[in-house]
Amino acid sequence: MWTLVSWVALTAGLVAGTRCPDGQFCPVACCLDPGGASYSCCRPLLDKWPTTLSRHLGGPCQVDAHCSAGHSCIFTVSGTSSCCPFPEAVACGDGHHCCPRGFHCSADGRSCFQRSGNNSVGAIQCPDSQFECPDFSTCCVMVDGSWGCCPMPQASCCEDRVHCCPHGAFCDLVHTRCITPTGTHPLAKKLPAQRTNRAVALSSSVMCPDARSRCPDGSTCCELPSGKYGCCPMPNATCCSDHLHCCPQDTVCDLIQSKCLSKENATTDLLTKLPAHTVGDVKCDMEVSCPDGYTCCRLQSGAWGCCPFTQAVCCEDHIHCCPAGFTCDTQKGTCEQGPHQVPWMEKAPAHLSLPDPQALKRDVPCDNVSSCPSSDTCCQLTSGEWGCCPIPEAVCCSDHQHCCPQGYTCVAEGQCQRGSEIVAGLEKMPARRASLSHPRDIGCDQHTSCPVGQTCCPSLGGSWACCQLPHAVCCEDRQHCCPAGYTCNVKARSCEKEVVSAQPATFLARSPHVGVKDVECGEGHFCHDNQTCCRDNRQGWACCPYRQGVCCADRRHCCPAGFRCAARGTKCLRREAPRWDAPLRDPALRQLL
């Protein structure tokens, strides 16, 4: 929060300006920067708005019409929209206050300030708390699913996930323009959002009935036509029967007029639901997982731990981790990225993951050779073959092209009717042949196959399972597998590769002849073939039992080719990052004798 300096001089009418304690001259006023270490010029709100107070956000909304006159509907950092008692406003980072457009919020959100120049302070946090956009911009989802920034406040995000329009405008993608009540504007392009590089905050949210979807706090879960859940941007909302819209609490959906009706006969526009966020744990292996937004990292015990960053860097001490793009400085205990330095984080133990209930559901068989996904309904197509209606227990229409939700009847022109309500029918997709495997699949037996690049392994149930490695070794517990050339250590839950034990170096008497297959070290010493000469800590020679081995700086240990010495010579680390889906155990260090 900025601290105002020389306020008395300002109110006394010193239009000539004021001088900051650091000697800087400002035309109006001097403010202490948020960090408290420097000053900059500012202009407090003297005329229209209160000097030290912002305004509290009001009730939920989706458009300005849902707010009182003179108020505006703005997008907040929690992912919902609320009414702000300014006609044009920006949301503060605390999620509870707002300021007029053209101003920025203090750190605690209770004050509004305007800086000289165009540089804005602070940022708008995108809903997942990992990305942020500059002040007076809007978070919009990009084509790849990441967050982007539309360079205007409270913007309308277009369906192509590339463009955006001003607040209240409609995206006309066909003619590449934005349509407003006063005219048209060109489409604006979004820019990628910036990662905040701080730990993911698991904010409070509403869990939907499917136990896999979440909506932001202060919103309501409503089912979509697809059977999945969407979020109505207000608490305790009324979900409309078309599975597309919703209305505020204690109102009724009027789908014919596209309005929400209250007991006082007041009407508001229907609200459109937004897709819910699917809660998907990050899988470390078949048994262990971390929360969404975390990264799996090995602990010192060899078990999995959870780092509170996405795509994090796991530090070599197996205790700490750093944000993506940073490197671990084990001496300082920090994360480094050029001149930037942040504290590193400790990992938390991972938890056992439950099987995905959707993955356990079998396909719906249409006949002996055709099937549909578990949440679909088999309906015949005009060709006589089977098709899949994308909703469970659907009504198959007689035109063999459409289907309707349960409780509806098929009517003309591919529509569905229930009472006075009419919705568009759903088109069917061809069913898949259940008995034919993919032409490039690897057959386990006559009825079961695994994708190419994987290995068939016996499962606990007596059938087959797929190991996500080629030519893998199937472990005897029938739950795990290891890469080719490794053996399963079920007790340690690891994959191990046998390496020959260390051999002592042999001292030779001075002789002009050295064995043909021996490796000459010098000074009358040699090592056997497929070994490597290394200097020992007594300035003599020792033998590393690896061919082209790497001699560690402690002069007591060595590592195989392709590895590097770490942890002061007590550990070997691969020079190339291991596969994410094949957590292999590093070879044991060998003592030099």
From Swiss-Prot:
Carbohydrate-modified residues: 118, 236, 265, 368, 530
Signal peptide segment: 1-17
Entry annotated with the keyword Secreted: yes
Record's comment on post-translational modification: Cleaved by ELANE; proteolysis is blocked by SLPI and is concentration- and time-dependent and induces CXCL8/IL-8 production; granulin-3 and granulin-4 are resistant to ELANE. Cleaved by CTSL in lysosome thus regulating the maturation and turnover of progranulin within the lysosome.
Entry comment describing in which tissues the protein is expressed: In myelogenous leukemic cell lines of promonocytic, promyelocytic, and proerythroid lineage, in fibroblasts, and very strongly in epithelial cell lines. Present in inflammatory cells and bone marrow. Highest levels in kidney.
Location(s) in or outside the cell: Secreted; Lysosome
Gene Ontology CC, one term: lysosomal membrane
Transcription regulation recorded as keyword: no
Record-level Gene Ontology MF annotations: cytokine activity; growth factor activity; protein-folding chaperone binding; RNA binding
Single GO biological process annotation from the record: blastocyst hatching
InterPro entries: Granulin, Granulin_fam, Granulin_sf
Intrachain disulfide bonds: 126-139, 133-149, 284-296, 290-306, 297-314, 307-321, 315-328, 322-335, 366-378, 372-388, 397-410, 404-416
Keywords: Cytokine, Disulfide bond, Glycoprotein, Lysosome, Neurodegeneration, Neuronal ceroid lipofuscinosis, Repeat, Secreted, Signal
Induction: Increased in response to lysosome alkalization.
Homology family: Belongs to the granulin family.
Quaternary structure and interacting proteins, as annotated: Progranulin is secreted as a homodimer. Interacts with SLPI; interaction protects progranulin from proteolysis. Interacts (via region corresponding to granulin-7 peptide) with CTSD; stabilizes CTSD and increases its proteolytic activity. Interacts (via region corresponding to granulin-7 peptide) with SORT1; this interaction mediates endocytosis and lysosome delivery of progranulin; interaction occurs at the neuronal cell surface in a stressed nervous system. Interacts with PSAP; facilitates lysosomal delivery of progranulin from the extracellular space and the biosynthetic pathway.
PANTHER family: GRANULIN (PTHR12274), PROGRANULIN (PTHR12274:SF3)
Annotated function: Secreted protein that acts as a key regulator of lysosomal function and as a growth factor involved in inflammation, wound healing and cell proliferation. Regulates protein trafficking to lysosomes, and also the activity of lysosomal enzymes. Also facilitates the acidification of lysosomes, causing degradation of mature CTSD by CTSB. In addition, functions as a wound-related growth factor that acts directly on dermal fibroblasts and endothelial cells to promote division, migration and the formation of capillary-like tubule structures.
Record disease entry: Frontotemporal dementia 2: A form of dementia characterized by pathologic finding of frontotemporal lobar degeneration, presenile dementia with behavioral changes, deterioration of cognitive capacities and loss of memory. Gestural apraxia, parkinsonism, visual loss, and visual hallucinations are present in 25 to 40% of patients. Ceroid lipofuscinosis, neuronal, 11: A form of neuronal ceroid lipofuscinosis characterized by rapidly progressive visual loss due to retinal dystrophy, seizures, cerebellar ataxia, and cerebellar atrophy. Cognitive decline may also occur. Neuronal ceroid lipofuscinoses are progressive neurodegenerative, lysosomal storage diseases characterized by intracellular accumulation of autofluorescent liposomal material.
Protein name as catalogued: Progranulin
Lineage of the species this protein comes from: Eukaryota, Metazoa, Chordata, Craniata, Vertebrata
Originating gene: GRN
